[in-house]
């Protein structure tokens, strides 16, 4: 839905695009703690959600692509080879909501940004489809039917994997999603919150 919307309306101020982005991001966040199996192949989880980005790799990578008018901007097939920081939902957030990147340049730059939005959303769709296919064609069956010759040898090992994912997800929320922006009493750091530019932090 996000990629389709972007093909029809790639303006970063488009309400339809913003709504589709938020819906797609919500879908990912609900499953983002399941960091095993298909999400870990080819760093797919990072390709969808490269955060935290303490060194500013995402805006730097996107700025380079746009200022150098890199041909990869118009090539969804090749875009999977760019820096992982320039991919996924946080790259889209910068393109849509960052004051500098969303307003950068002249009319030609606006066309490039529009094309990049379309390419990033197609890349998100491709990565998401690969994860879904991995679950549907193979990995779900491994969890449901453990076997001594399979990834999971018993129901107990399946439960351990799921419990580990849950605990790790809760720790990430506590230490990173909440801990980073809270900082200290004397020095809170709200701009370290996840997805603060799009006003989504509390949804995560």
Question: Which role fits each region the language model picked out?
Answer:
Residues 1-204:
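Mature extracytoplasmic or organellar-lumen-exposed domains after removal of signal/transit peptides
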């Amino acid at each position: 839905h996000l990629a389709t919307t972007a093909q029809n309306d790639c303006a970063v101020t488009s309400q339809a695009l913003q709504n589709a982005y938020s819906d797609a991001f919500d879908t990912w966040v609900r499953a983002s703690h399941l960091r095993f199996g298909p999400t870990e192949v080819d760093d797919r989880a990072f390709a969808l959600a490269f955060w935290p980005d303490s060194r500013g790799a995402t805006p730097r990578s996107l700025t380079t692509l746009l200022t150098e008018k890199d041909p990869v901007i118009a090539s969804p097939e090749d875009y999977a080879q760019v820096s992982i920081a320039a991919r996924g939902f946080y790259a889209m957030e910068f393109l849509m909501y960052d004051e500098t990147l969303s307003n950068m340049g002249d009319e030609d730059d606006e066309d490039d940004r529009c094309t990049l939005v379309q390419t990033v959303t197609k890349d998100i769709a491709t990565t998401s489809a690969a994860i879904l296919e991995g679950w549907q064609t193979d990995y779900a069956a491994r969890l449901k039917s453990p076997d001594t010759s399979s990834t999971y040898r018993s129901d107990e090992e399946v439960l351990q994997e799921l419990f580990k994912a849950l605990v790790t997800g809760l720790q990430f929320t506590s230490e990173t999603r909440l801990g980073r922006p809270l900082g200290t009493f004397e020095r809170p750091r709200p701009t370290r919150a996840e997805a603060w530019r799009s006003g989504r932090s509390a949804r995560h």
